[in-house]
Structures are given as structure tokens and as C-alpha cells.
Amino acid sequence: MKFRTQMYKVVSWEQEIQNGINISKKIENAYAKEICIAMSKDSFMKDHKAPFDITIQVLKGSIDFGVLNQQILLKTLDSISLKAHEIHNLLALEDSIVRLTLYKYDSFGRVESVLKS
């Protein structure tokens, strides 16, 4: 008897918020990568940019999102899409969980390098 390969994966975005910023890859498929960014209150991701378009969604908490010399308040379930090469930054106003959607050819390592620089 031949069994069918599992065609789906259920992913929990619930994260324990630790001190600072922690990232993990949640989903990778033929189209995109989904990254979870857990940010403790007052943690900051300095100015950076992506080589492809991205989408950012706040799943929990609130983020002061800086882009194009503006500060935008993103609250739970708010999202924003950016074109490639737009410089942006994130400040967690409270413990927050952020969903980052990357183009399939972007890399998880690039996101990690933002935290290390």
C-alpha cells in the first residue's frame, strides 16, 4: 500500500518573548519564506533594506515602524508592504511578534545579519 505524502504543515506563530530580538524561519515553499521576529519591549532593528519586496505584519504587540522619514504605528494585525531597497527600521513599543514575508530568493541569513551588524 502506498501512502500519500503529507501536503500541509500547521505552524504556530506563538512565541515566548525573550530579551532582545529573536528570529526563526517558520515556512519556506516555492514562492516565499515566512520569518517570525520576536521583539521584547524597546528592542530596535536599525536601518536596513531588503533586495526584494517584503511584507511585514504585526501578529502581537505594537511596532514603531520607520520608513521614508516617517514613523508609522503598526498595531496587532496591521501590515505594511515595502518595495525592494526601501530603508526601514523597527522599534518594539511592547513585547511583539512580527511576521516577515520574504521573496523565495531572499535569504534568512540576510535577516540574521541585520541583527548582528
Describe each model-derived feature in a short phrase:
Residues 40-42, 77, 85, 95:
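Tight coil/turn sites that cap or link beta-strands
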